């Protein structure tokens, strides 16, 4: 535990007027401030109703005073909460009184930062506080709460413990060469390594789902000109976000629209029609479309169900196959069902490809697409599964997986225990970045500075 020398204060409730406003104080002067403001000694962990006093003994407000001596508090330090009326003037006067008594204004996220530094929370849990506050759907809020309760951290710690056990075995064999352990023939190391890689892959998959729920899924609408891409964007957005005409090539640039489906955020990107063209401006639009396809979380490949080439849509644009994400992230949209003989519906092939037949113009089948996109974001997770994750967590997991893959290759092809030991160390370090065990100070500063003041 790190002892803080400064006492900090901030308004913990949202800006503006409200029924209740909270001023939070943390640090060694919290107890003295409690006596000065409330005019009496406060019993620990009890709510005391009474006046809040200024320096002259005049009443600023009336409300509840709660004192939590450290280390049994949110920050691990002495903490005081003053819960009064939610008027900004009253709250500012309370903060000013605390400043007069020796506290200083807290930085954004400093309360959570102190909780982290005092081992009350790890870094993933601290970030989950902000995620819970900013959650835009019930599922995102549930996931953030599970991360705050330590679910994500437990998964990471379990992987770390397995890596430590594996490192002990490998490094002991290196330190005692007289034992002459053949890592490859032994089978024990390879078995443990495969187990860790499998479990890491599972955590990566669940973390990716959690990140989509938190940050929103980027959905790129792609296809040939006049397939109805812009009409589909307008239908999803519920407004005329894109110009729609019968002229092929109307959309020449990337158009972005941010929407919510049952509170779940989606970043929908309409792109230029994919075709060979001599038009310089349209050619740039096609290049940008292909780039957007490569960066998408999900691609909606839109085809005109009335066109002859719709029978084999993936042959419409060969470069699409090179730029698109993995096959499971592509949904085929057979549009203009109102002009064809096809029935509205959703089909899933044996290889996992999903095809949705709809009409963007009439809206028929649009609800199927919405439900499909919600499922892609993890909307169907139960309350007992899933956790919140951020992009930096995904990157740390990716790098850990990369290190394990390299170590596995070294073991299989070279039987190189020394190189495997280094890869295991790197994988452990990358996992430690998630919980804060191995995190540079500048990164910590960036993370906590993004929090609300008073959190």
From Swiss-Prot:
Places the protein is found: Cytoplasm
Biological process annotations from GO: tRNA methylation; tRNA wobble uridine modification
TrmE-type G domain: residues covered: 216-378
InterPro entries attached to this UniProt entry: G_TrmE, GTP-bd, GTP-bd_TrmE_N, GTPase_MnmE, MnmE_dom2, MnmE_helical, P-loop_NTPase, Small_GTP-bd
Pfam family, one: TrmE_N
GO cellular component, one term: cytosol
GO function terms (MF aspect): GTP binding; GTPase activity; metal ion binding
Binding residue positions for Mg(2+): 230, 251
Entry keyword annotation includes Metal-binding: yes
CDD domains: trmE (cd04164), TrmE_N (cd14858)
Lineage: Bacteria, Pseudomonadati, Pseudomonadota, Gammaproteobacteria, Pseudomonadales
Chief location: cytoplasm
Note on cofactor: Binds 1 potassium ion per subunit.
Sequence similarity: Belongs to the TRAFAC class TrmE-Era-EngA-EngB-Septin-like GTPase superfamily. TrmE GTPase family.
Function in brief: Exhibits a very high intrinsic GTPase hydrolysis rate. Involved in the addition of a carboxymethylaminomethyl (cmnm) group at the wobble position (U34) of certain tRNAs, forming tRNA-cmnm(5)s(2)U34.
Cofactor(s) recorded in Swiss-Prot or TrEMBL: K(+)
Record: residues binding (6S)-5-formyl-5,6,7,8-tetrahydrofolate: 24, 81, 120, 455
Assembly, per entry: Homodimer. Heterotetramer of two MnmE and two MnmG subunits.
EC number: 3.6.-.-
Organism: Pseudomonas aeruginosa (strain UCBPP-PA14)
Keywords, comma-separated and alphabetical: Cytoplasm, GTP-binding, Hydrolase, Magnesium, Metal-binding, Nucleotide-binding, Potassium, tRNA processing
Residues given in the record as K(+) binding sites: 226, 245, 247, 250
Protein's recorded name: tRNA modification GTPase MnmE
Gene3D superfamilies in UniProt: P-loop containing nucleotide triphosphate hydrolases, Probable tRNA modification gtpase trme, domain 1, tRNA modification GTPase MnmE domain 2
Transmembrane segment boundaries: none
